């Protein structure tokens, strides 16, 4: 038996009305129950629970850590910029008089100390009572650049490479008075990895310094740098495997720098009796141009 269209539509409307009435009654009962439990409030799906309170606390903690990470990262960038300026200033030493050399090294020493007492100390204060390994990636680039500048300055003063213990000592800030003597001193964590990568960067600066010394007839300094680079290369080879992908690329640059210094010293030994000292740098530049032109283009 067929049901008329009007009757079928009437039944549908009746069902819809019943559903609306049922939902309305359910909502009314829910609101009444919420008012009895929490007067003046209305229950909702976002009602606070203990679990949600915990997640809100976790969110605040993460926001604080992210903000601190960003501040440390910005300070690290400033350390990188200022350390590069110190390195560039010391690269101007070849050809200067002894008095000018001492003045420039003194200025560089003051700049390094200022970096330590301002930017790096700010990083140490940010990391007080924090796990430094959670933030080490934020300041590793600046720390490596600072170690490169410090080791370059130390080499020009003493002819040796600064030790890891010395770097950590310079970045440990003790208490200012006796009342704070019992407090744990502030410090920037210098992992062996950062120290090794920073010293690896030094080899490129020593190579540039050596080539500049050739044109100023400071031949003894060239041979000294060559000997130091050879000793460093042997030390790096003795390290074995180090879980740092950056070290592989730095070692490639290290080998290239050592090769250039050895070639410069070899050419210097052969030609210093034939070519004036002020022309040797032009000779080396000519050789470099010939080698670069002979390399096939990929």
Residue ranges and their predicted role:
Residues 101-181:
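Long, charged all-alpha helical bundle/coiled-coil segments in cytosolic proteins
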Residues 49-67, 88-89, 99, 125-133, ...:
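Short, charged/polar, low-complexity loop and linker segments
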Residues 71-74, 78-81, 85, 103, ...:
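Charged, amphipathic alpha-helical oligomerization/scaffolding segments
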Residues 1-26:
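N-terminal amphipathic/basic-hydrophobic helices that include classical n-h-c signal peptides
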Residues 43, 60, 64-78, 96-107, ...:
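Non-transmembrane, amphipathic alpha-helical segments
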Residues 19, 23-37, 244-298:
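C-terminal accessory extensions/subdomains outside the catalytic/core fold
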Residues 91-98, 124-127, 131, 161, ...:
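Structured alpha-helical bundle/scaffold domains in large eukaryotic membrane-trafficking regulators
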Residues 19-126:
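Leu/Val/Ala/Ile-rich N-terminal alpha-helices, chiefly Sec-type signal peptides and the beginnings
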